[in-house]
């Protein structure tokens, strides 16, 4: 469906020359003289190349229809990451390029938001937090509880993060999936 370039927002998916792009940033520029323009910074979904385009605010852009649904992560193999729609039991395979760094946080049975275009996965949204176990970290030093310094730790998924000094190996912690940072100790 055609929409005015000025109405696009961050996260929208547009179809340009048969390729899909996700909008990263939109800036409406109104110069003192001349026509107002909309500056779009986008990323091509197929290969991750970043593109910058300028449109007059009256020009139209083809907005792609994207279907967002909950899917359950099943497993990963040589083909890619396998997901199942819990309502229809249809299975989809997402390529490693679509999943990117988020694959480290996927666990069997995890429910995620999968965005598809013509039944092809194009984007993944994880839950805000995940609970993981610390497998390796430096031992805590007595008397260091009052300092605000953090120490490096390796999580059960292989990701490195910084944790407070009182956290020991074997402790289950809650991690923010957007940046991999420590949130709090798990209460289980």
Swiss-Prot record:
The family annotation for this protein states: Belongs to the elongation factor P family.
Give this protein's Gene Ontology molecular function annotations. Answer: translation elongation factor activity
> Which keywords does UniProt give here?
Cytoplasm, Elongation factor, Protein biosynthesis
Q: Could you tell me which pathway this protein works in?
A: Protein biosynthesis; polypeptide chain elongation
Function field: Involved in peptide bond synthesis. Stimulates efficient translation and peptide-bond synthesis on native or reconstituted 70S ribosomes in vitro. Probably functions indirectly by altering the affinity of the ribosome for aminoacyl-tRNA, thus increasing their reactivity as acceptors for peptidyl transferase.
| Chief site of localization | cytoplasm
User: Which superkingdom?
Assistant: Bacteria
Question: A Pfam family name for this chain?
Answer: EFP
Q: What is this protein called?
A: Elongation factor P
Which gene carries the instructions for this protein? efp
**Entry's InterPro entries?**
Elong-fact-P_C, NA-bd_OB-fold, Rib_uL2_dom2, Transl_elong_fac_P/YeiP, Transl_elong_KOW-like, Transl_elong_P/YeiP_cen, Transl_elong_P/YeiP_CS, Transl_elongation_fac_P
Localization (cell):
Cytoplasm
The processes (GO biological process) annotated in the record are:
peptide biosynthetic process
Q: Using the chain's own numbering, where are the disulfide bonds?
A: none
- Cellular component GO terms, alphabetical: cytoplasm
Cross-referenced HAMAP family: EF_P
């Amino acid at each position: 469906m055609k929409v005015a370039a000025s109405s696009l927002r961050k996260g929208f998916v547009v179809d340009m020359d048969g390729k899909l792009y996700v909008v990263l940033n939109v800036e409406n520029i109104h110069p003192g003289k001349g026509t107002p323009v909309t500056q779009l910074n986008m990323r091509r979904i197929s290969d991750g190349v970043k593109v910058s385009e300028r449109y007059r605010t009256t020009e139209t852009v083809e907005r792609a229809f994207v279907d967002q649904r909950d899917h359950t992560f099943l497993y990963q193999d040589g083909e890619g990451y396998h997901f199942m729609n819990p309502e229809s039991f249809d299975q989809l395979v997402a390529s490693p390029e679509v999943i990117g760094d988020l694959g480290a946080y996927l666990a069997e049975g995890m429910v995620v938001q999968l965005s598809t275009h013509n039944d092809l996965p194009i984007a993944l949204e994880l839950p805000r937090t995940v609970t993981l176990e610390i497998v390796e970290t430096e031992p805590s030093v007595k008397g260091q509880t009052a300092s605000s310094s953090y120490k490096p730790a390796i999580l059960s998924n292989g990701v490195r993060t910084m944790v407070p000094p009182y956290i020991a190996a074997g402790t289950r912690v809650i991690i923010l999936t957007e940046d991999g940072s420590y949130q709090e100790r798990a209460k289980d």
